[in-house]
Amino acid sequence: MRDQRNQDQDVGTPEHRQATLPAEITDAAAGAEAVVFVCATCSVPLTGPLTRLPEVPEAPYYAWWDADEPGPSPATVPSGCYAVETEPYGGPLVVAQAPGPVMPRHGGHWNVEGKPLVSQGPRGNIVINPDDARGLELQHASPACCGATPDGGMNQLCACGTLVATLCSDCCLPYELHLSAEHVRAVRP
């Protein structure tokens, strides 16, 4: 499964796997100061230098049902960038009063009784391109056909054993890694 690849290596991600952003957003990111995200427990770097985007981009369109090979959708956030998620993301999922997206850039989700669900996960996650992560290990991910879903909450371990992030990598979902704002910190490179 793609999630279990060595994230320390440059895997040569094809261009179609990258998000394409409007020039005004990429220009703003180019002028921003880069930071490295480290584990709050052990201070090990979890990313290389990343520059902040003004907001999380919309997930690129991807016809996953027509893909030649199963795997993740194109990344929501371009390589070398990050953005802060302002809405709840990941588990736990709770019954909602009305149907709607279960979390940002996701469609509806229902429990076995047909009731709509919504994320009650944390706000303020740092959203990055999963290919920009270093040294993380997949832990107890909610499985789907081609990868991990964020439904069960954090699923990425630092080398020290601390859960630090939530990977979303199934073919029909946005390809994103959400670093937990409570478990990582930004430092200057």
What are these regions (language model features)?
Residues 1-189:
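N-terminal pre-domain and mature-chain start segments
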